[in-house]
Amino acid sequence: MDEFYSDNFFDGNAPIGWSERDWFDYLKKSEREISKFASVYSVNRLRGKNLDEIATIAGWPIPKAGDEYFEESDAEFSDEPWTLLNHPVYIITRGLMRCLQEHLGRVIAETQISPALVWDISKTIGETSFFMALGANSTDLSEDLLARCNYKMAAVKLNEIMAKLSEIETPASTQGAERMRRINAIVFDLRQLCLNLAEESAAKPNNL
């Protein structure tokens, strides 16, 4: 196992003193934060809180125009390199996608929808995640109009997901019907997040 964490493997661009093992720990920390966000979202959305409130409770407030959020990110990352893996939009998006995939998997098992539709939905979810990540990365590069384009593309993909979800018959069980309701709520939250971030990107002073 030590060979897998070789300190000499592609470490040329690592922060001073960081080894490959440090980076693996960093990756695991990001995954823990994503899982935490998913749990906080699942509990608090049922209590009627909106995504902005939930993100703040989870320690990952949604960035607003002009925020220096990279200096105020979760305390667990405060002394570590700033990368996409500890970007609030990345953590929030991955957390929401995790919730979406969990509920969708259960609904698919209950309703036995066609493999073609399952593939279409899965592919579009992946494309949405891709555009959301590009949007966050573009913001970090100060390419705000590019970020806006990526967030708008993500919103388009979420519209496609909504259309595909409408093809799924309402599950017979009460639990299945509730999962469908939650799936639609998650997609709505993701879409609203994309639209808000696109608007924030357009509102930045250098784009006026």
Where are these regions (language model features)?
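Amphipathic alpha-helical assembly/interaction segments
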Residues: 1-208
